[in-house]
Amino acid sequence: MDLLRSLPLGLYLEQPQTWLHKLDPRVKFIWLMSFLTSYSFANNLWRILLVALLILFTLIARIPRRVWQQQMGWLLTLSFFVLAIAAISPDGLGVDYQSRLPTNPQVLTQSANTNNSATATEQLKSSKSYTYVLFHKGPVKVTRRSLDLAVRISTIIFTVIYSTNLYLLTTAPEEITAGVESLMQPLRRFKIPVTEITLTLTLSLRFIPLVLEEVQNLVRSVMTRAINWKKLGLKGAVKVWMIVAERLLENLLLRASQMASAMMVRGFTSPNEHRVPWHDLRLKLRDWLAIASLTIFWGIRVVFGNQI
């Protein structure tokens, strides 16, 4: 169960402070949304480019290898596994291959002159260069559609998970809250409780490590008791894990109650009366450079990344 601690899901890396840490959280949030939204209606080349950009950002930022190596390795392994499974799976299309006779009836009645013969020869050569089935050996068959679906699924898994984790890794929960609250300021005109939403977001981000720690401790306690799972059988094993899940829920509710008590002791009554001083958000030169890069990013996406 050391996997929970070795994979820093939703955890903030305090040291070392990289250039990604120093960017404005609002700029990083817009970059994150760009990664998640530019994927839609994009071609496969753009989807692969997003994966390459995420890996490149991680390497350029000089994030310690111990932080990202195992998680990126697991995600890449999962993505390649999904790619392989989806590529050899049926594509769901009952494709009719090229018919023996031309579909246009006029071709049968045309006179066989030299120009028509040359045109037909060129069309025949071009049609032979295209193959719908890319690989077929025994029960394994890879088609163009199955490969396209495999690339879509595998890249979106890596992009969604790793881009979100990279954002949480380089942005403190308080910075995320301040950035989201700043971006949501126009919603106050519609009487939307922006402060309550951002406070809930902060507490949720702070609660993620506690959940991982509780799961880690409970599973370790079960493993150290040397339970004979074969004697218990399926019904007994399910009963044990139901007890563990019940205990986990009790511990999480206890942690939440302790957090609420700590806020009450500190005089917290409501978000509007107890203002928490978040970070002073000001755009600097590096933030404007990131915004300019974002403009170039979307320009390339619109010109070259559209799905054909």
Swiss-Prot record:
CDD domains: EcfT
Paired cysteines (S-S): none
Cellular compartments annotated: Membrane
Keyword line: Membrane, Transmembrane, Transmembrane helix
Cited Pfam families: CbiQ (PF02361)
Annotated membrane topology: Multi-pass membrane protein
Chain ranges passing through the membrane: 41-61, 75-95, 153-173, 192-212, 288-308
Entry annotated with the keyword Lyase: no
GO cellular component: plasma membrane
InterPro entries, alphabetized: ABC/ECF_trnsptr_transmembrane
Domain of life where this protein originates: Bacteria
Similarity comment text for this entry: Belongs to the ycf92 family.
Protein name: Ycf92-like protein
